[in-house]
Design a protein with these regions (language model features):
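Phosphate/pyrophosphate-binding catalytic cores of soluble transferases and nucleic-acid-acting enzymes
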Residues: 1-142
Length: 142
């Protein structure tokens, strides 16, 4: 392995599989910082559905990727990748290890394959889809 090439570490898995406890243990033993890769944890106030680390755990190990945006705002993969790149770059400057932890497959895959920066959906299309949903429900969108 190239010593000059930084390494990212990953823990991924389904909800309630023990990722958080394993991540805390590994991060403490390996002097690492944790970057959350959870598409729900990025939102402020979404604490139950995302199993965010406790304040105590956050004081033991530096965490990133939590509470980045108000729940009523749009936060997409391109914003997450820009944020994650900044966190990783700064950590490497400090010679700190980064452990990426999460169960959001789409966000995790973005570390390994290219994604579209941003998909712009016109207001006309949004209105059309919304009208279809109101008229026919979810089955109309399938």
């Amino acid at each position: 392995m190239d010593k000059d090439c930084p390494t990212l570490y990953f823990i991924a898995g389904v909800t309630a599989s023990g990722k958080s406890a394993l991540a805390m243990d590994w991060a403490e033993k390996n002097n690492a910082e944790i970057l959350s890769c959870d598409s729900i944890a990025i939102y402020q106030g979404m604490n139950i559905g995302s199993a965010k680390p406790s304040i105590h755990d956050q004081s033991r190990v530096q965490h990133y990727g939590l509470d980045l945006e108000n729940v009523d705002k749009r936060y997409d993969i391109s914003k997450y990748l820009k944020y994650a790149k900044g966190v990783i770059t700064e950590a490497y400057k400090r010679k700190s290890r980064i452990l990426v932890v999460g169960g959001s497959g789409f966000y995790l895959r973005s570390f390994f394959s290219a994604v579209v920066d941003e998909v712009v959906v016109s207001k006309d299309i949004r209105k059309s889809v919304e009208a279809l949903y109101l008229d026919e429900g979810l089955t109309g969108l399938l």
